[in-house]
Amino acid sequence: MIPFELDNHELSYQQLIAHIQSFINSLTIDKSAIVAACINLSGRINTQTGYSYSYFHLHEIPLADSFTNDIGITTFIENDSRAMAYGEFFGGGYDASHALFLNMDYGLGLGMLLDGKMYYGKSGFSGEIGHVPMFQNEIICHCGKKGCLETEASGWALLRHFKEKIEQGVSSAVMRN
């Protein structure tokens, strides 16, 4: 595992490029044999245009094109939950024509395959279930809205709840030596 912190800054982008280049250089095949690469990121990804609306708004061109230029290999981008759904659907050995894949990580995402094809929805962003308004709370989500499902039921919400309980004096085995 290579330590890496995804952040919407030039340094994070350059570190990611360096990790990818290092990986490519470690391969025993010639770089020209690599047909394409796909980089999976969380958040809103438009696979048709190659834009990420969540990360690396650093250049005037689509993110997929930036990766292609900097890596030297045709690169596509995809939402992480949809990529996981693809992997599970095609690599999981299941005999099904439809699938749902729930990704509960730092945020919440859903990948949907219908008749073996990824479902993107009308806007191209289907599966962003973490931003469905569900709660009457004053917690501001990463998307800027209040009350999203992610504010109470996601990795970052669980961490926030844990920290609040510890600050209130609740004991936890996690805090023991």
PLM regions: where:
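Glycine-rich phosphate-binding loop and adjoining helix at the ATP-binding site
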Residues: 3-98
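Glycine/GP-enriched mid-protein hinge/lid loop-to-helix segment characteristic of carbohydrate kinases
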Residues: 7-15, 72-177
